């Protein structure tokens, strides 16, 4: 295998060719950073968190594929992943995950002690999540904690503390993660039932679509509460109203449980996150200019 071919397999293992996971992890982290900084985050902290998100999401994908290496070959969507094909060895995968995590840890060294301490929890969550699919009926909830942990870290980095709104925002985001990752799990539901993997789509059963909608609605209600806690203005709520419209469109996509349309709905959540972020940024900019 040539070096170029090996690098392509590493790229696929880290999902750099499919950045949706990075974006879904990045948006709530940016929400938290902007709210903590009241619209003016420090540039160095912003850069560290953007790069750290890319590194840790990549490491998480490598660990996920390592954990699922004996299952992925039996699932239509994942059978061509590098570990499932044997194109990358388990030793290479573990070394790659460790290297990415080390670089991410070195990246946050300029930040305060609380942020560094929280990073150990974030690392544990990212590394342990893939194994929860073997025994936990709702692994998407665990993923929600892992994918939301950039929020308290952002508050800690910017303010030196993690106040109540940070934890509340984390809880709201957890519901969003359950919603969109259930859509993702609906794509593989038949295969997961056959091989014994546990997911929220299986746990919800015939109420999977209802579960997605309820989690999305609870998420938006939580974001309304965040707006009240942070004294955000009308532009923020316009952003939330737009996000509601996007979510209603997702319901149209998933109601018949077609695999391709469920996957499209999952991808569509990027626009939900981006819209809410735009609402936060613009709200602070307008208030600063007035």
UniProtKB/Swiss-Prot annotation:
Ribosomal protein as UniProt keyword: no
Which Pfam families does the record associate with it? UbiA (PF01040)
Q: What class of enzyme is it?
A: transferase
Which EC numbers does the record give?
Answer: 2.5.1.39
Q: Which domain of life is it from?
A: Bacteria
Membrane topology is: Multi-pass membrane protein
Q: Which InterPro entries match?
A: HB_polyprenyltransferase-like, Prenyltransferase, UbiA_prenyltransferase, UbiA_prenylTrfase_CS, UbiA_sf
Q: What does this protein do?
A: Catalyzes the prenylation of para-hydroxybenzoate (PHB) with an all-trans polyprenyl group. Mediates the second step in the final reaction sequence of ubiquinone-8 (UQ-8) biosynthesis, which is the condensation of the polyisoprenoid side chain with PHB, generating the first membrane-bound Q intermediate 3-octaprenyl-4-hydroxybenzoate.
Please state what the protein is called: 4-hydroxybenzoate octaprenyltransferase
Species for this entry = Nitrosospira multiformis (strain ATCC 25196 / NCIMB 11849 / C 71)
Gene encoding this polypeptide? ubiA
């Amino acid at each position: 295998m040539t070096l170029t071919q090996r690098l392509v397999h590493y790229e696929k293992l880290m999902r750099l060719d499919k950045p949706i996971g990075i974006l879904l992890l990045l948006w709530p982290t940016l929400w938290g950073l902007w709210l903590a900084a009241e619209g003016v985050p420090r540039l160095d902290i912003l850069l560290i968190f953007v790069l750290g998100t890319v590194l840790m999401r990549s490491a998480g994908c490598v660990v996920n594929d390592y954990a699922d290496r004996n299952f992925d070959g039996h699932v239509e969507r994942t059978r061509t992943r590098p570990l499932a094909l044997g194109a990358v060895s388990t030793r290479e995968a573990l070394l790659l995950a460790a290297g990415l995590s080390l670089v991410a840890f070195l990246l946050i060294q300029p930040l305060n002690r609380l942020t560094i301490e929280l990073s150990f929890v974030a690392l544990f969550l990212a590394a342990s999540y893939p194994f929860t699919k073997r025994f936990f009926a709702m692994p998407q909830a665990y993923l929600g904690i892992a994918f939301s942990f950039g929020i308290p870290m952002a508050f800690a980095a910017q303010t030196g503390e993690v106040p109540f709104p940070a934890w509340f925002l984390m809880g709201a985001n957890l519901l969003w993660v359950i919603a969109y990752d259930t859509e993702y799990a609906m794509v593989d539901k038949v295969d997961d039932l056959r091989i014994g993997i546990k997911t929220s789509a299986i746990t919800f059963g015939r109420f999977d679509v209802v579960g997605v909608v309820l989690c999305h609605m609870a998420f938006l209600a939580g974001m309304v509460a965040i707006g009240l806690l942070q004294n955000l203005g009308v532009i923020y709520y316009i952003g939330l109203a737009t996000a509601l419209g996007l979510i209603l469109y997702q319901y149209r996509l998933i109601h018949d449980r077609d695999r391709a349309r469920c996957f499209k709905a999952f991808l569509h959540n990027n626009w939900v996150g981006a819209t809410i972020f735009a609402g936060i940024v613009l709200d602070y900019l307008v208030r600063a200019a007035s």
